[in-house]
Design a protein with these regions (language model features):
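Short, membrane-interfacial amphipathic segments enriched in basic
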Residues: 1-40, 217-222
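Membrane-interfacial helix-loop-helix connectors in multipass membrane proteins
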Residues: 71-94, 162-204, 208, 212-232, ...
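Membrane-interface helix starts
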Residues: 34-59, 237-240
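Start (N-cap) of specific transmembrane helices in multi-pass transporter permeases
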Residues: 137-157, 231, 235
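Final/C-terminal transmembrane alpha-helix of multipass membrane proteins
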Residues: 228, 234-252
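Loop-to-helix entry region at the N-terminal start of transmembrane alpha-helices
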Residues: 48, 56, 60, 81-114, ...
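Hydrophobic alpha-helical transmembrane segments of multi-pass membrane transport/permease proteins
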Residues: 56-71, 249
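Short cytoplasmic-facing helical segments at TM-TM junctions of multi-pass membrane proteins
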Residues: 118-143, 225-228
């Protein structure tokens, strides 16, 4: 009986959460046009989301490329195909690992920070004060963060892709003895523009989704500091799950459309 009660309660909470997130998305879409004075806020959010997250994203990309190249080279050498490690690394990073790892690592950091900031404003009634004086808090607090994420996540993903490919080259050249020109030539032969654009398109969707989750959980925070801690923890988990689940559906859609 307790299990059924928990399932019903959890089901209601899940429906309410998805519905609230959808409504927030619609409200953001209706308020995308910002006054010039708000562009300063967008620039500040770009710095917070992108510049301050580069070290994490690029370090992860470097070692991901190295590990992927190492594992691929060892196994492909069995079949005499070690010269084709480059395309395997490139396709894996450009289509999947680059956008997904960037979204999970940077997104978890960014979204939890957004939840903590907006949640503290909610529990201290600052958002209620903005409403009381007639300020559109969606336009002032949410839209700049979403726009910044839509710009930053693709740019960080592009840099992560490049660093990941360089990491793969380091292993292939210095550990496996493959000519670096062969590494890049095989990549340029097998990898086409749509492989690159697939990952960039995913990163745009991930950026918007991650930011909306962080904002929504912050706005729905209740229960003081304890509730703020729960909201921040929930955001990290929900961001990771949202990226992984949406990646499957995006991959399926892109394969149907372009392959």
């Amino acid at each position: 009986m307790n299990v059924l009660a928990y399932a019903r309660r959890h089901g209601r909470e899940s429906v309410a959460w998805y519905g609230g997130l959808g409504l927030l998305t619609l409200r953001v879409a209706r308020n995308l046009q910002l006054p010039p004075s708000y562009l300063v806020i967008v620039a500040r959010e770009i710095d917070i989301i992108g510049v301050r997250s580069l070290v994490v994203a690029l370090t992860a990309a470097l070692f991901t490329g190295m590990v992927l190249a190492l594992q691929s080279a060892v196994n492909m050498a069995i079949f005499g195909a070690e010269n084709y490690v480059g395309p395997v690394v490139a396709l894996s990073i450009l289509r999947e690992l680059g956008p997904v790892l960037t979204a999970i690592l940077v997104g978890g950091k960014v979204a939890s920070g957004i939840t903590a900031e907006l949640g503290s404003m909610k529990v201290t009634e600052q958002i209620d004060a903005l409403r009381a004086i007639g300020v559109n808090y969606i336009k002032k607090l949410i839209v700049p963060r979403v726009l910044a994420a839509l710009v930053v996540f693709p740019l960080v993903t592009i840099m992560a892709d490049g660093v990941g490919l360089l990491g793969g080259m380091l292993i292939v050249v210095f550990d496996r003895g493959v000519d670096p020109y062969l590494y890049w030539n095989t990549i340029s032969y097998w990898v086409v523009m749509k492989d690159f654009l697939t990952g960039i398109g995913k990163s745009v969707v991930f950026g918007g989704l991650i930011t909306l989750i962080g904002c929504y959980n912050g706005l729905e925070t209740t229960g003081g500091t304890e509730g703020l801690g729960r909201s921040t923890t929930d955001t990290v988990v929900q961001v990771a799950m949202a990226v992984i689940v949406s990646d499957f559906f995006l991959t399926k859609l892109l394969l149907l459309l372009f392959w």
